[in-house]
Amino acid sequence: MKFFIDTADVHEIREAHTLGLVDGVTTNPSLIAKSGRKFKDVIKEITAIVDGPISAEVIALDAEGMVKEAKDLVKIHKNIVIKLPMTPEGLKATKQLSAKGIKTNVTLIFTPMQALLAAKAGATYVSPFVGRLDDISQDGMGIIEEIRTIFDNYGYTSEIIVASIRNPIHVLNSALIGADICTIPYSVMLQLSKHPLTDAGIKKFLEDWEKVPK
C-alpha cells in the first residue's frame, strides 16, 4: 500500500518524508488556504521535496475551464496530478485530460457508482471520502470494499485513494480491503507508529539498563 500525505503544510511534508512514509501528496483549496501562501509557490515547493504524484486541484466548474487550468498546472512539474470534482463537467474534463496523457484524480466521491463513472472516464485515481461519510452515519469503509470489488470485476486500472481519513483504523481497514493508497493527515501518520505497550517497553528497557553495572 502507498501512503500519500494529505496536507499543504510544507513542514509536515518534510517531516513525514524523513520518516520514509510519503509516496505522494494530495492538496485541495482548503489546505492551500490554510497555508496562507500562493497556490503555485506551495505546489512547486512540494514537488522539490517528494518525488511522487502531487495532486493539485482545479477551481473551475466547467470542463473547458478545468482543462485550461490543468494544462497550466502540469507545466509546474512532471509529477503533477490534476484533481477534479466528481461532477458531469469533471468527468468531461477527466476524459479529455486522460486522452492527452495527463494524470487525473477524481475527488469528492461518496458512492461506488461515482467511482465507477470516474474509472470509465479514464481517471488515474479515484478518491472516496470515508470520514465524511462516517460523519453522517454512513459506512465509509463499506464503499471502499464495494469499489474494490467493482474495479476487480471489470479490470479497471484506476487506483483507489482512500481520503478523509480520521484515524488509524481507517488505514488498517483500507489495507485489509486492498485499497491502493491512503492519503493521510500528518497527525494520523504519527498515530500509526504509537502504542502504549511500545512506550512501556522502552521505559522498562531503560530502567533495566540503569541497573547494569557500568
Swiss-Prot record:
Predominant cellular place of this UniProt entry's protein: cytoplasm
Recorded catalytic activity of this chain's protein: D-sedoheptulose 7-phosphate + D-glyceraldehyde 3-phosphate = D-erythrose 4-phosphate + beta-D-fructose 6-phosphate
Superkingdom: Bacteria
Keyword Secreted: no
GO biological process: carbohydrate metabolic process; pentose-phosphate shunt
A Pfam entry, by short name: TAL_FSA
EC number: 2.2.1.2
Active site: K83
Summary of the function given for this chain in its UniProt record: Transaldolase is important for the balance of metabolites in the pentose-phosphate pathway.
Protein's name according to its UniProt entry: Probable transaldolase
UniProt source species: Trichlorobacter lovleyi (strain ATCC BAA-1151 / DSM 17278 / SZ) (Geobacter lovleyi)
Lineage: Bacteria, Pseudomonadati, Thermodesulfobacteriota, Desulfuromonadia, Geobacterales
